[in-house]
Design a protein with these regions (language model features):
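N-terminal secretory signal peptides and thylakoid transit peptides that target proteins
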Residues: 20-38
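Hydrophobic core
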Residues: 38-45
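Sec/Tat signal peptide C-region and signal peptidase I cleavage site
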Residues: 46-52
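Short, glycine-/small- and polar/acidic-enriched structural segments
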Residues: 52-205, 209-216, 235, 242-243
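Secondary-structure end/capping motifs
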Residues: 258-342
Length: 370
């Protein structure tokens, strides 16, 4: 048999002839060191969202499951919150005031509510613990508007002088009407109160001359009661001297302190979903129908599109940036709310808003160009 050729003994590759560690050995040591750091980071809950501990988030909307609620229901249904290590439950609401109160009480961690309602709560409950804070602006402009039938002869806001207006006492537009009234030199208005389902009905049958309400709600409700939209005149507050912010995502003070990373992840996942809703409202409505099977899909699709066009992708929103709020505008609104709502104390604008939890600019760049 053939004999193998003798080979001189080799020194281990990990040791050089002078006894110092080789490049391979150093590489292995660095790898072990990096692995140890990664393991420690995982133990401490640092790193990517996938490594973070799952957080439970109780969220309440401002109103029923309607078109605009797709902004929250889509990212939930598509698993965007879950992928961000968030266990999110979403409940319907019955008004922004109630949502603010329930977030303050701790019943909910986060919510969707009107900024004026948030300011009112702060100013009327200065000593209350756990006051909610707005962390992302969604409706850059208030949807509040005054609506009347053209046959009433009302052609401009000033024509409302001496007229009878109707709205529920807690309606955002009614409460902010003194600001609209001052901006448009309106005098001698009489108010009639009613439950929300009767508001548009009373206008349609002539019991009141005009109503206040969210434009994308009242206009479609009037149409459902047989009124043609061509027969309606509408005065959006945002276009008539009232630069109020609309609805924002709010968080309890306690939740912000205990779960700041969870709030950031929520806003990132929400922004991802909102981008899809704005791009394809018709598809997004299917997620609303999944939560409330009796909705009118065509009607709610129109409601969502109206909300997107009028208050989400508005001129002000594109100027300021989605999700953002500007300090001077907040300060003016705080002063106007203090006066119009006759609050116990003046609204402190700096206490009701925090932009530190917002995603980066790229994530927030979700508004399509017009």
């Amino acid at each position: 048999s053939r004999l193998r050729r003798a080979v001189p003994p080799q020194k281990p590759a990990s040791v050089l002839t002078n006894g110092t560690p080789s490049a391979l050995q150093l590489s292995r040591r660095r790898g072990l060191h990096a692995f140890a750091i990664a393991a420690l980071s995982s133990t401490l809950g640092m790193g990517s969202p996938a490594m973070a501990q799952e957080a439970k988030v109780r969220f309440q909307l401002d109103w029923r499951f309607e078109g605009p609620s797709a902004l929250f229901l889509l990212p939930a249904a598509k698993g965007y919150f879950k992928a961000a290590q968030l266990d999110v439950t979403i409940d319907a609401g019955n008004g922004s005031g109630g949502t603010v109160t329930r977030v303050a009480s701790g019943t909910y961690d986060l919510g969707f509510a009107d900024m004026a309602a948030l300011m009112e709560f702060h100013a009327n409950n200065p000593d209350a613990p756990n006051k909610p804070v707005a962390v992302m602006m969604v409706y850059n402009n208030t949807p509040a508007a005054v609506m009347a039938l053209k046959k009433s002869g009302i052609k401009s806001p000033k024509d409302l002088s001496g007229k009878k207006l109707g709205a529920p006492v807690f309606d955002a537009g009614r409460k902010a009407f003194p600001v609209f009234q001052k901006a448009n030199a309106i005098s001698n208005v009489q108010w009639t109160a009613m439950d929300p389902p009767l508001r548009e009905t009373m206008l349609a049958r002539g019991d009141v001359d005009a109503i206040t309400g969210f434009s994308f709600t009242s206009l479609l409700n009037l149409e459902a009661r047989g009124v043609k939209l061509d027969d309606v005149v509408s005065f959006p507050y945002a276009e008539h001297g009232v630069k109020f912010y609309g609805n924002a995502i709010i968080a309890s003070e306690k939740f912000l302190k205990e779960n700041p990373a969870a709030v950031k992840r929520f806003l990132e996942a929400f922004s991802k979903g909102a981008r899809e809703v704005i791009a394809n409202p018709a598809a997004a409505i299917e997620h609303v129908k999944a939560r409330d099977g009796i909705i009118n899909v065509a009607l709610e699709t129109r409601r969502l599109k109206l909300a997107i066009d009028s208050v989400i992708n508005s001129t002000d929103a594109r100027s300021e940036g989605f999700g953002q709020a500007q300090a001077p505008r907040l300060a003016l609104m705080a002063s106007q709310v203090s006066d119009a709502f006759n609050t116990k104390t003046r609204v402190n604008a700096s206490a009701i808003w925090s932009g530190q939890f917002l995603p980066d600019a790229k994530t927030l760049d979700i508004l399509p160009k017009r």
